[in-house]
Amino acid sequence: MHIAALHQPSQVQLNQDGNLKHFLTIEGLSKENLTKILDTAQSFLDDNNNLINRPLLEGRTVMNLFFENSTRTRTTFEAAAKRLSANVLNIDIARSSTSKGETLRDTLWNLEAMAADIFVVRHSSSGAAHFIAKDVCPKVAIINAGDGRHAHPTQAMLDMLTIRREMKKPFEDLSVAIIGDIKHSRVARSDVAALQTLGCKDIRVIAPNTLLPVGFSEYGDHVRLFNNMDEGITGCDVIIALRIQNERIDSPALSSQSEFYRMYGLNKERLSLAKPDCIVMHPGPMNRGVEIDSSIADGEQSVILKQVTNGIAVRMAVLALSMQGQLQEQGLIDAIAL
């Protein structure tokens, strides 16, 4: 399964009315589509950043299918579904029939027959969620919880919500730096795509050459690549630090983790080069002392734990929006900002 096979994702993700049917990738969605997700997520948070429960998916069944390990993403999807009053089933892939040789198609068809409304899928193969939505279970709403190096759209949207809530200014006026293992990161790709779609004109991608993918500059004129960390973060509003994806690296990309920290680790001295009100983000899991110093991760400018709360709100929004047509039919549409 390869990214190159993913043609015209908007035709798969949106229904004939232009509303969300599946959420597979940021690419192919408009600024209006993304803003709708952010506005809906915002409606699930009060002024004190507390989550608001809404029984919008009562009677629906959400199945979490994680073919890769996860803590935050799987747990926040489960929390999001339960806050919407959905039935939640966490499928133990390691003990499922796939371990006995059953194909992915047969596994999914059997789960679909159990009256699943939404599949939340994480898979090591790039394009897996798109394949499922287009060719296997098109009638079930498919939410991509991360596919290989390709995309992590809900992470990108929770990052965008965090930036919007914390910075309180248009994306057009922000400078955002993304630091770390860009080459192997689905978060980096989705964040850059979301930032561009929402109008950010100063996106800085910072990494050694060995951790920069070929062709990343094709995202457009507003993306700049930096090998020099200090130069890249000077004057920025937002810093997103990424861990080194050791599980996806086929050949040595670094001389050592200590060398990476020396050259690219975010510490107090480097953070002082950014704007005084710069916020620091990280999708997790963090490797303290590698891409980020503990004093920064736990410091006043860190919004890392707020990202987790915002992640539940965003995933509530995506789950609800994927059921939008049915919610409209049942008169529940006015309950949230859809």
Curated annotation (Swiss-Prot):
The keyword Transferase applies. GO terms for molecular function: amino acid binding; aspartate carbamoyltransferase activity. Transmembrane segments: none annotated. Keywords: Pyrimidine biosynthesis, Transferase. L-aspartate binds at K100, R186, R243. InterPro entries: Asp/Orn_carbamoyltranf_P-bd (IPR006132), Asp/Orn_carbamoylTrfase (IPR006130), Asp/Orn_carbamoylTrfase_sf (IPR036901), Asp_carbamoyltransf (IPR002082), Asp_carbamoyltransf_Asp/Orn-bd (IPR006131). Heterododecamer (2C3:3R2) of six catalytic PyrB chains organized as two trimers (C3), and six regulatory PyrI chains organized as three dimers (R2). This is Aspartate carbamoyltransferase catalytic subunit. It comes from Acinetobacter baumannii (strain SDF). The lineage of its organism: Bacteria, Pseudomonadati, Pseudomonadota, Gammaproteobacteria, Moraxellales.
